[in-house]
Amino acid sequence: MSVIDTEIAVDIVKIYAAWLERFGDVLERRAVGELVDLFDDDSYWKDVLAFTGGYRTFGEKPDIARALEATIDGTAPKGVRQAKGRTAPRLVRRSAKWVIEAYFDFDTSVGTGTGFVRLLHDEADPANPRLWILLTTLQELAGLEEGVGARRPSGLEYSHSFAGDNWADQRRKAQERAGDHPEVLVVGAGQAGLALGARLSQLGVKTLLVEKNAAVGDNWRNRYHSLTLHNEVWSNHLPYLPFPDSWPAFVPKDKLAGWLEAYAEFMELNVWTSTQFLGADFDQAAKQWSARVRRSDGSIDVIWATHLVWASGGTSGVPNIPNLPGLADFDGPVIHSSSFLGGNEFSGKKALVIGTGTSGHDVAQDLHSNGAAVTMMQRSPTCVVSLVPGGTLVYAVYSEGPPADDVDLVTAAIPFPVLQNSYQYLTKKTTELDRDLLDGLKARGFKLDTGPDRTGFHMLYLRRGGGYYINVGCSELIAAGEIALMQHDEFETFVPSGLQTRDGSTRDFDVVVLATGYRDQQEGIRDALGEAVAERVGTVWGFDDNYVMSNMWQRTGQENFWLAGGSLLDCRLYSRFLALLIKADLAHVALPETELASTRYDSSGLTSIIGAP
């Protein structure tokens, strides 16, 4: 860092310290009018549990004022102070603005919170930055803090009783007794279940995870041979245990699977593998779930738990098998992409891959690499972006240096309109960077899409969990004609030898792979828990009225039932808040509540700060 850079950094720290003193004073005095005066006219406040007991976004001064008036007394914020152990205040460029990004801690009526701000930096008046974005989050419940850091166990008890059980004995017995009325039963031990299990464990919540696979990590280990994560390692750490600095930027699926298995062991999580969840009933009077599971020996256990968490796949639950004309008449194997392990057995064969999302492209490339003649059938337009640099730009903030836990608050702070405009900008940029590739695809008849509001692949992930491909080589194969392409509009019906097109011609195939995605998680819930529970829960994934994933990591319409899922980043970020919600319920801690809804925004994206790509 140069002398000039050092001087700027010192000035920013001083400017923020002075601003935080003013902010803390008016917040503790509950002087809403003075507090709102600190906000810019175009500003946002996002709250996670601290003031509202849920997820809310309020935009512009009138709505922010109403929300503060409704929540500030119940929250009783005080003790506003510089955040301990967080990244120092810094001046950065965001959304074409120079802003000061900084953190603060505060106390509430029920615990401790952490806030994050983006202050608009004005070179003409640097001492008086305007508050553009405010995030407030609940981090701990008073007296019920995590057992980490200075609160970690001493371990001395294991050296005092030489004749008694040692640590390994106690862990073995804990695993065996884990089904004896756990407070929380988690269905699924993938990244969502493990992250939440670790958070709950550190809060002293008795938790059992049941996993249908033979080993933790098999949900990744048993996927197709060539699979590698498409976002970088520094955005994918799990709680408490980051990946080693020596790991590759893009982690292979088997390496991740081994890490998840080790994570369960190192975090001392009680996991029953080879255990099939059969269903559960909720006793309304007792406020308890009665769950049935089949163990590896075929025996059926009944487990009583207060809370039930569905963590069996996020957006990737039950495979979607479309009703395609004549498919039952096809003589060859028909495989859903979730069951596709690799293309080596199809060398020299003619393969049809239906679907052009990420799985469809990866399966097609795998088959091609193993010597198959591959045709892809496109059912709908697809967003395509190169892995580097386009696909990684969304996660670029995680490569700037601050710890992932700090950057998670940056991520959580972004309000929907800013997110939308940022993604429109990134999509325009990546479209320009990928121009030659995209032109090559269009020349082959590939139908491209950037979403209804031109926000690109990551917004498609957030809205529907698919509809995009981050290119790692398959697009070049399509553009070069090495992988053939047909449109679903050409298809008439399957026949024993392959398919018949609408012009009456036939095409022969030896195998069909359905890369057709997954059913809504609500359907998996319907299968396991019944119609009534599924209807109370409602739609899963996609933005809800508060601009968070619908019914994920938050209260659902079914009492004591929760859902967890999504990317590794999602699981790390939101597992903290779901664990706090569950712990508060178990400890009878009443979090603040509000009937206020988030400020509504036009999600169609018809207006934007940038032009169309």
Predicted regions located by residue number:
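Short beta-strand edge/turn micro-motifs at domain boundaries
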Residues: S2, Y103-K173
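Flavin (primarily FAD) cofactor-binding/catalytic cores of flavoenzymes
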Residues: T137, V205, V210-K212, D254-L352, ...
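A short, basic/flexible loop-to-alpha-helix module at the beginning of a structural domain
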Residues: E157-P182, I335-S347
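N-terminal Rossmann-like dinucleotide/flavin-binding domain of flavoprotein oxidoreductases
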Residues: K61-F106, S226-S296, R464-A484
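Short, low-complexity N-terminal intrinsically disordered segments enriched in polar/charged residues
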Residues: M1-D41, Q170-P182
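A solvent-exposed, acidic/Ser-Thr-rich amphipathic alpha-helical stretch
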Residues: I15, D25, R29-A96
